[in-house]
Amino acid sequence: MAQEGWSETWTFFEGQWHEGNVPLWGARTHAIWLGSSVFDGARAFEGVVPDLDLHCARVNASARTMFLNPTVSVEEWTGLVREGIAKFAA
């Protein structure tokens, strides 16, 4: 039986995958302090990830709109997302 309130979590940070809910942000983190973060709502289901390349492109476009310089290319994002999805049972 699954533990109530628990879900499998993987976090990509500093070039590697970490299992669990790794604490990444502190009170002085720019994204928290000044709201400088971007996100997009890509979803994976039934073995597909519709428009993943477009979702990843929007993340980088949103960063540029906020005068942030994306440090990960769309192709790298796409690969990381697929790598992360593979860590979960189908």
What is each stretch, according to the model?
Residues 1-90:
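Conserved alpha/beta cores of soluble small-molecule-handling proteins
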